[in-house]
């Protein structure tokens, strides 16, 4: 869900500042795709951190770090702007690597290590369907509803939307912390 929110709305949000004279000529507005590409660079680096974090902190904590990273990413997007607040956008893009990799990659590794060989490919398929299929669909429909309800005419209250997305990620993280109980031998 969080991945689809960020994929669907980060660029339109940043480029929406073009309509505000103060920000229209800023680097972030003029080159939003370059700014957003920092996310992919961060992702490439953060994937290298997963073995260390998995061994040291275990699957549950690594996935919780990812969920908190989504909260931070959305919060920074809500608080930032392409002018004096561009550093928040940049930090948000860098946090993306932790948010994406620590959830998706470690989740796939957990499924890989905790399912029998006879059902492993089906379990991986189910994980992908739930995160990138059903989760993506529900996420985009819900996010679009939030964006629509905070848009009047052509003006969207993006700050409120990003804070709602951050609150959602926080609630999911809390629920995950309470209900996810990996076996001790599988936790690290």
Region spans (language model):
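Extracytoplasmic gate region of multi-pass secondary transporters
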Residues: 1-33
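Loop-to-transmembrane helix entry/capping segments in MFS-fold secondary transporters
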Residues: 29, 115-128
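Helix-to-loop junctions at the C-terminal end of transmembrane segments
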Residues: 45-59, 147
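C-terminal ends and interior cores of transmembrane alpha-helices
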Residues: 69-82
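Hydrophobic core of transmembrane alpha-helices in multi-pass small-molecule transporters
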Residues: 87-102
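Intracellular juxtamembrane helix-capping segments at the cytosolic ends
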Residues: 102-116
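A membrane-interface helix-boundary motif in multi-pass transporters
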Residues: 145-169
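Multi-pass alpha-helical transporter architecture, strongest
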Residues: 161-188
């Amino acid at each position: 869900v969080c991945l689809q929110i960020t994929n669907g709305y980060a660029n339109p949000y940043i480029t929406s500042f073009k309509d505000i004279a103060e920000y229209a000529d800023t680097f972030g507005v003029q080159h939003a795709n370059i700014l957003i590409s920092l996310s992919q660079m961060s992702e490439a680096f953060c994937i290298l951190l997963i073995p260390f974090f998995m061994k040291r902190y275990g699957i549950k904590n690594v996935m919780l770090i990812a969920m908190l990273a989504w909260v931070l990413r959305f919060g920074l997007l809500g608080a930032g702007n392409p002018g004096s607040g561009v550093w928040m956008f940049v930090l948000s893009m860098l946090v993306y690597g932790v948010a994406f990799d620590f959830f998706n990659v470690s989740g796939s590794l957990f499924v890989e290590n905790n399912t029998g060989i006879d059902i492993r490919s089906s379990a991986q398929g189910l994980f992908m369907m739930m995160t990138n299929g059903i989760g993506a669909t529900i996420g985009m429909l819900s996010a679009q509803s939030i964006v629509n309800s905070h848009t009047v005419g052509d003006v969207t209250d993006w700050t409120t939307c990003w804070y709602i997305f951050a609150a959602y990620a926080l609630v999911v993280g809390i629920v995950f912390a309470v209900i996810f109980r990996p076996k001790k031998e599988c936790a690290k």
